Amino acid sequence: MTDFNAIDLDEGTSKGSPSPEKRDAEVQQLAKQYTQQSASSIYGQNPFCADAGSALDPNGDNFSARAWCKAMLQLQTEDDKAHPPRTLGVAFGNLNVHGFGSDTDYQKSVGNVWLQALGLLRKALPGQRQRKIDILHGLDGLVEAGEMLVVLGPPGSGCSTFLKTIAGETHGFYIDKASHLNYQGATAKHIANDFRGEAIYTAEVDVHFPRLTVGDTLFFAARARAPRHIPGGVTINEYAAHMRDVIMAMFGISHTRDTIIGNDFVRGVSGGERKRVTIAEASLSMAPLQCWDNSTRGLDSANAIEFCKTLRMQADINNTTACVSLYQAPQAAYDNFDKVLVLYKGRQIYFGPTATAKQYFLDMGFECPDRQTDADFLTSMTSPKERVVRPGSEHQVPHTPDEFAARWKDSTERARLLGAIEAYNAKFSDGQQLDKFRQSRRAQQAKIQRVSSPYTLSYTQQIQLCLWRGWLRLKADPSITISSLFGNSIVALILGSMFYDLNGDTSSFFQRGALLFFAVLINALGCGLEMLTLYAQRGIVEKHARYALYHPSSEAFASMLMDLPYKILNTIIFNLILYFMTNLRREAGAFFFFLFVNFILTLTMSMFFRSIASLTRTLVQALPAAAIFILGLTMYTGFAIPTDYMLGWAKWIRFINPINFGFESLMVNEFHNRDFPCVNFVPSGLGYADIGSGNQVCSTVGSVAGQGFVNGDAYVESLYDYTNSHKWRNVGIIFVFMIGLMFVYLAATELILEKRSKGEILVFRHGHSALTGKSHDDEEDAGGRTVAMAEKTESDDLAIIERQTAIVQWKDVCYDIKVGKENRRILDHIDGWVKPGTLTALMGVSGAGKTTLLDALATRTTMGVISGEILVDGKQRDESFQRKTGYAQQQDLHLSTSTVREALTFSAVLRQPAHVPRQEKVDYVTEVIKLLDMTEYADAVIGVPGEGLNVEQRKRLTIGVELAARPALLLFLDEPTSGLDSQTSWSILDLLDKLKKNGQAILCTIHQPSAMLFQRFDRLLFLKSGGQTVYFGDVGENSHILIDYFVRNGGRPCPPAANPAEWMLEVIGAAPGSHTDIDWFSTWRKSPEYARVQEHLQELKLERSQLTDLARTESGQKRQNKADYREFAAPFYEQLCEVQYRVFQQLWRSPMYIYSKTVLCSSSALFVGFSLFRSPNSIQGCQNQLFSIFMLLTIFGQLIQQIMPHFVAQRDLYEVRERPAKTYSWKAFMVSNILVELPWNSLMSLIMFLCWYYPVGLYRNAEPTDAVTLRGAQMWLFIWAFLLFSSTFAHFMIAAFDSAENAGNMGNLLYILCLLFCGVLATPDQFPGFWIFMYRVSPFTYLVSGMLGVGLANTHVTCAANEYLHFDPVNGSTCAEYMEAYRTTMGGYVLNGDATSDCSFCPMDDTNAYLATVSANYGDVWRNFGIMWVYIVFNAVAACALYWWVRVPKGKKEAVETGAGAEAQKKTQNGSA
């Protein structure tokens, strides 16, 4: 396995620490000579055919990236067919970038979101202009091919915008027309369109398919950019595999090749390794111009330096150009760059060689403190608090950004730069270089690819590659596919058994129609969950499109093809079971037509749902739209509302409904040219035994008097207006829909991008604004500190910090987890302690187990076995330990809708001891805000990255949330400076120093400390790979104690100017390119320092244990206050009140969620109501009113799909941050989330009632009974119960599942069963005996029965013209006389009672008779309502029970734990930092 630490980027020569003194000098010299000779002998070799173990073998330990690059370049140069290498420099002049909007925004809520709509309307009016916000002001610069530019500036200074502009990604902002960009003769338009993948921007976030392995992810990227002709005689797949191996070796991730990448919720590689995968993927684009935005975030300093060295090597050998923003740049990283750009609030204050940048500001009157890196010094110019002014120069130096920019514009350095830019523009003004660039690009592209296309592969090649990746993704995670197949098979079996062996007579007519209706719906609408999958991958696909790896539409087309086998298999299994179990038409042609129509309907509706997902930008937008369309497609299929009953205003819907055409074809396929014996004649029974056939008629629609059968064609034509001549015509129409929707889907994937953030803006609640302690001008006028200034005095705010006395110690701590069948040790016998008033650093390479150790000490592991001894004041930890410690996690996880003050107050109220008055807790929060300098944005909304708090503000809030809890024991911080610039990191350490001086005990992991930052720590716990201790002890002034230990044990001396934090990594062989033969773990265990640690641990244990026992003895009791030892500080009632208030507040501030629910409920109700507007009380009219209820229930699936993703987001926050901190219990979390839906569902039920009940006209049925008000109230209660049931059912489903998709599959299965067995599609007497229990347990049975009873009971029925049965009475009788006996027994009425021929008989005279046919009774209304509440309560209780059983960790943390909740944990799973 190739390790990142073993990669040699400098021709195989070692830059690591020397061997111990005992090593023979001659052996070193011989080894050096051998390495040089082997390096010089490989340049003529083919790198694809390198000898195993040579410097060109990426899978060997001797791999040299520099040697490989040179050999590859030589191979390309010697091959005439290879594309000539491309280079791309850039010159920019007067670069101005602006956006539109405001520096601050207000938070949208349910109450004020309409103000935004009014604002948008006002902006659309003529003469109204948006406010212009300048982002970059007049930048000039030149980065030639083969040069590297480092961009420095604090967050918000415009670094990201500059890099995006250079890479041609200008979404959301605009470049002024007067700006000039020259890419060696190409314009910005050329770069953005024709050469998109030649200039790439890599963001600092890591977005990948989590289930794919690292090797497959990088092979895909290499294959997508593989040139047409490959030198060296290898195939394109061999080329891609080799490039993958090389790039993995370069970035030290070869050992992760077969490990899935993972993400925050799926276990995979460590965070640092995932960052390197992102870097490697971008590098494989082979772009000649690369823009890297803080890509070293999450890497330790050694790997950050190695990243910069790799870019340097690529620039030297391949002439690539790199622009890199770095927030924390070690000196060794900074020295790799040629030029530096310093930005100060969007203004350029320096551009030029890195070697002279420092001197430029020194000459201006500033001073650089000792051991401060050049990059930190340059960035400090943008911070009035950090820049140091030389005594006597206070009035000469610039103070504000504008003054710095003006000083730059008047400088000789800028004049030289402008001259260089002018020469560059003149050099590339004739277009020759652009033509050469285009020719080189063309030589790399596939032959059939368009010349102007930014993509390398042809469209068909892209589809093939995406198909391969789709297959890998399916293999890696087949759970959704398998669960869908399983679920549909179960539904087919249930549906088949429900309609088992239908009779071949007229008694099965309605059942056959209902069966075909439900079958076509399940086939057509089963693809609805594809929307969730598409949204999950959208960000990844768009990133790859920016890298010009493939068209988004090619991935879309490939995913369609990839789903085909599943769709074919699903169609065959489902329809085969259904068709033959139910005794549908037993003819081969009819069966295969049935199969074929359902298959093309599945494909068509798949395109439909994919189109909705691609045309919308968020899932919240997509779900209501999908719900309305599904409702329309279902209602206008022709079964729920026959054609003759469709109202004129909506009749056109059936012509754009592919399901309508499919249903018609299936109905005529089943009924055409078949005669069905009649089983029910009118009149019949006692007194009618001897009448002739002409005196009675079959009771089925389409019958003819005197015939003992009903013709199938007559039936479907009379009832549905269907004809057999439309059978194949409809198939053609469905095909047209499928092709049309497919093109809509493919076009939408190319044209409509995912919603992106607006940029970093503060968001306040409406009516609130920023508070500033002092004016902006005052801050800038301060100009910086002087050398003579005394260190500023500590704030009185320190007095508020809880002074600690307890000592936390640990000895022989080990942590083992099970990987497969083997146990893997993550932590290996670690010792240490943290005392009050000390700041201890926990350091080590990525994967050394730093975060795992924090989790183990803080009792936050969710799996594995912890052994060893962890004590607090000599005693074992109790249940209250977790809430008495503060743990600031690396990920800044907060509720996005809360304000800063609210987040701090929530933590304080629930985590501080219960005996502290609430007002005192609130006052304490105000003091914490002052201490953390958050007053300016204390009332700002946290938001999401980009729209809300910036990185620094989030980090301060993360620390503040823990301080607000007043941790009594210890403060853990995991990477508090990760992603921050050096000045902000310094301010965070200032804060930690304040806390330390007031007695706070702090243990802090840190990745990239500068020498000055490192010096601020008192003690160091240093780990190596495998979780083994290398050193634990004091750091000492100028790190002399630490340095002395390593030098004394064989390490090379530390140069005076070196950063000890980087030097010690090199000494232990953990830095890339370094090597050591010393086993530093064994050295530590044998050292006198280790012995002293063991002695002191024993002393601490005895001393602190005795003091604790003495204190307890003096108090006269073992536990003075039981509340101090409880698991949670606040009692359950207080937890529930606080959490309930916050959850309700969150929904109020999530208007998209509430209004999407409102739109779904209101529009669905209106659509159903007006589609069946004032439905008459005919037989079919009663059926329509029944189906209006049934159709209203079909939004159930969309209701639960809205709730489940929302719940998952809340659960992740709770399980990752709030549950481990013991902020509140899982019971409060579950109950609050269930109860918060109640008021909104109450409101929705009222809206649904008004929008549906009155348009359908059900109130008219209550008028004859004088109970209009009562029955209206009863109907509202049932709708209310339906929405409450939907909400609690959604929580019941998602409680145990990790993803909304899997919960949705299970929910859909149960939902379909509820619909099947509710008595609408088949009455209870038609069920096989086995299934009658399902009718009784289906909640929809009581819902439909109750609503139908309330809506239809106790009124008259008047038959429609086609519902009257026509026959002649016996001779000598009137129609009334002839039907009297039958009517008395069976009901009904005669329209023309006095007639003696052609009697018109309606078989039903009141709605109660109709209710009896569907087993509904108005007398059961209150019983049914009560049963619905039983189901609601059951759902809520079951949701809580399931959550406890599956996701709540149980037992001691020191024992083997369940993996419940592990998917939500962001840390510890991998045992990596």
From Swiss-Prot:
Residues in ABC transporter domain copies: 115-370, 808-1050
Keywords from the named record: ATP-binding, Cell membrane, Glycoprotein, Membrane, Nucleotide-binding, Transmembrane, Transmembrane helix, Transport
Location of the region described as Disordered in the Swiss-Prot/TrEMBL record: 1-27
Signal sequence, renumbered to the chain: none
A GO CC term assigned to this protein in UniProt: plasma membrane
Main location: membrane
GO molecular function, one term: ABC-type transporter activity
Membrane found in the keyword field: yes
PROSITE patterns in the cross-refs: ABC_TRANSPORTER_1 (PS00211), ABC_TRANSPORTER_2 (PS50893)
Residues carrying a glycan: 62, 294, 319, 1371, 1470
PANTHER family linked: ATP-BINDING CASSETTE TRANSPORTER
Known function: ABC-type transporter; part of the gene cluster that mediates the biosynthesis of the sesterterpenes ophiobolins, fungal phytotoxins with potential anti-cancer activities. Acts as a specific transporter involved in ophiobolins secretion.
Family: Belongs to the ABC transporter superfamily. ABCG family. PDR (TC 3.A.1.205) subfamily.
Designated name of the protein: ABC-type transporter oblD
The organism of origin for this protein: Emericella variicolor (Aspergillus stellatus)
Gene designation: oblD
